[in-house]
Amino acid sequence: MTLLEKTRKINAMLQNAAGKTVNFKEMADTLTDVIEANTYIVSRKGKLLGYSESLPIENDRMKQMLTERQFPEEYTQSLFNVGETSSNLEVSSQYTAFPIENSDLFTKGLTTIVPIVGGGERLGTLILSRLESNFTDDDLLLAEYGGTVVGMEILHEKAEEIEEEARSRAVVQMAISSLSYSELEAIEHIFDELNGKEGLLVASKIADRVGITRSVIVNALRKLESAGVIDSRSLGMKGTFIRVLNDKFLVELEKLKNN
């Protein structure tokens, strides 16, 4: 492939990702294909977002890292010291992508570190590695362009997460506001009793202890269930099993209790 063809292939990653869930594995595959190197896309917290290997490394520690999809904290933190692309780092470098315990097997191993930056902040790191042949200026151009595309997708994913969080919080607030005073009181007692995200509720016991009717409890649970905030399942004489579906619910409920 020519440099132009390789650039177009990276550009296609951005076009294909439009409106879809970000697939960092496919992005890593593309970068491995055009740069001809092992590719690791690592978040700022060391999570392995996606990777592709043209040369699999037979090392138990590396295999475990790939399985757990998590890079060591010390290594991840050290990457923040790399503020711009650092290329052709030898196996003796602290930033090497090759296992240092097997450095004698990878004496010709070379690593390139590309910071992923977007919106004025460090979003992660693109790590490339291969044996023998140096990363050329063309390779570095492709790597930095690839890092920019990955950064745009990380920002897009973060924006979607923020939007989803806001939507979840709004649903919870609407559901809680639909409750009457007595229903809200009943819900507070129910989740004090559960002391967690799920558990078994005996409505009659709570009704007797708090001094409210069982129908108030039933109505409150129905409102929350219809809003998709909780799921409830009758177990007959044993009671009702309740599970919280919206993670923001308990947070908002706690805020109300503290106000």
Curated annotation (Swiss-Prot):
Main localization (coarse): cytoplasm
Gene Ontology CC entries for this record: cytoplasm
Compartments, as annotated in UniProt: Cytoplasm
One function term, GO molecular function aspect: DNA binding
Keywords linked to the UniProt accession: Cytoplasm, DNA-binding, Repressor, Transcription, Transcription regulation
Superkingdom classification of source: Bacteria
DNA-binding region: 203-222
Cited Pfam families: CodY, HTH_CodY
Annotated segments matching region GAF domain: 1-155
Keyword Transport: no
GO biological process: negative regulation of DNA-templated transcription
Family note: Belongs to the CodY family.
Biological function: DNA-binding global transcriptional regulator which is involved in the adaptive response to starvation and acts by directly or indirectly controlling the expression of numerous genes in response to nutrient availability. During rapid exponential growth, CodY is highly active and represses genes whose products allow adaptation to nutrient depletion.
Protein name from the UniProt record: Global transcriptional regulator CodY
Source organism: Listeria welshimeri serovar 6b (strain ATCC 35897 / DSM 20650 / CCUG 15529 / CIP 8149 / NCTC 11857 / SLCC 5334 / V8)
